[in-house]
A protein has these predicted regions:
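Structural detector for internal amphipathic alpha-helices that build alpha-solenoid repeat scaffolds
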Residues: 236-245, 268-277, 299-310
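Alpha-helix N-cap/helix-start positions at coil->helix boundaries
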Residues: 232-233, 249, 263-268, 295-296
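A short hydrophobic beta-strand segment most commonly corresponding to one strand
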Residues: 141-142, 179, 193-213
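Amphipathic alpha-helical scaffolding segments comprising HEAT/armadillo-like alpha-solenoid repeats
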Residues: 218-224, 248-259, 279-290, 313-320
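Short acidic-glycine-tyrosine-enriched beta hairpin
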Residues: 142, 157-189
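Short, conserved beta-strand element in jelly-roll/cupin
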Residues: 137-152, 156
Length: 322
């Protein structure tokens, strides 16, 4: 592997590495010190504490007044881009990620509130092909188009949460200055076409106890996936699924304990994964849940227990908790 002489020299000089990063951090501090940005970040603190957006004027103006979001973003780029060019081995001073044509830079994270600058590449969106499903997350979301354009749809759903949904579509053209506000788990937006790139400034706030995120098939509204709306539970669900794929039977007792607390959706997933890894351990916790009449999962747990006993009578011999 070829390593440039500049990079080789930098690897041998930790002080120079720190200086590069300090230079970029100085650009970040300069942007944060701008009056409009400082007021916006002050309001972010109040927004994260539960204040309505209308009660946070500096923040509200960014997502309602024409040109403010572009001005804030241009101010950031005016500080950050020269610093990154002059210190091209430094990392951006904000958390960032890039995957499948979607780049996200997190400008602020305060409690359950996130302020992010996002960029979607049209070529990558085209390569994915036509969307077959749409996800609805329980969060308040405000977006301003900073640059680029796109054809999109606002998607609204009605019907039962755990069954087929009726999906209604409203076409929208996203152009610089366009503003979208989406609140709650019953509406979202779907980008269909981006000629080049779409740059968006996004503000999100997740409730303290969010509803599960739900994914529906676009063609008929069938529910195809449901996951916890809580970040910690969502990460735990991914870990449970990974343990299941790995066949980690030794994790079954841990999953059994996880099945006793948390949201109903999370607990049900823990029961299923526990059953798949260790039928006896899973059946014990399933029985425990089914016998607790105060438990909101008692009825579905009892129904599943009856089905399993019908198919696998030998489970009747499993010693279950009192």
């Amino acid at each position: 592997m070829r390593i440039s002489s500049e990079l080789r020299a930098l690897r041998a000089d930790p002080a120079a590495q720190r200086q590069l990063q300090d230079n970029v951090q100085a650009a970040k501090r300069s942007w944060l010190g701008q009056e409009r940005v400082a007021l916006m970040f002050r309001d972010l603190e109040q927004f994260a504490k539960g204040a309505e957006l209308q009660a946070c004027p500096a923040l509200e103006h960014v997502f309602t007044a024409p040109g403010i979001a572009a001005s804030v973003t241009e101010g950031l780029l005016a500080e950050l881009l020269p610093a990154m060019r002059a210190n091209n081995f430094a990392h951006p001073p904000f958390p960032y990620q890039y995957s499948d044509g979607l780049a996200i830079m997190e400008l602020a994270a305060v409690g359950n509130v996130r302020l992010s600058l996002m960029m979607l590449e049209g070529d990558a969106l085209h390569e994915r092909g036509e969307a077959r499903s749409i996800s609805f997350a329980d969060c308040e979301r405000h977006e301003v188009i900073v640059a680029g354009k796109a054809s999109a749809r606002i998607v609204r759903r009605t019907g039962p949460d755990n069954g087929p949904a009726r999906l209604d579509f409203e076409p929208v053209e996203l152009v610089p200055g366009a503003i979208l506000s989406i609140d709650g788990p019953y509406s979202t937006r779907l980008v269909d076409h981006v000629p080049s790139r779409l740059v968006t400034l996004r503000l999100t706030r997740v409730p303290v106890l969010p509803e599960p995120s739900r994914e529906y098939r676009l063609s008929d509204g069938v529910l195809v996936h449901q996951s916890s709306g809580d970040r910690d539970e969502s990460r735990a669900e991914l870990a449970m699924a990974l343990l299941g794929k790995m066949g980690r039977k030794d994790a079954a007792p841990v999953l059994a304990r996880m099945a006793l607390s948390g949201s109903d959706n999370f607990r049900w997933q823990a029961i299923r994964e526990c059953l798949a890894l260790d039928a006896a351990e899973g059946f014990r916790v399933l029985t425990h849940v089914s016998r607790d009449m105060e438990d909101t999962l008692a009825a579905p747990a009892g129904a599943l227990r009856a089905q399993l006993l019908e198919s696998y009578p030998q489970l009747e011999t499993v010693e279950c908790p009192a």
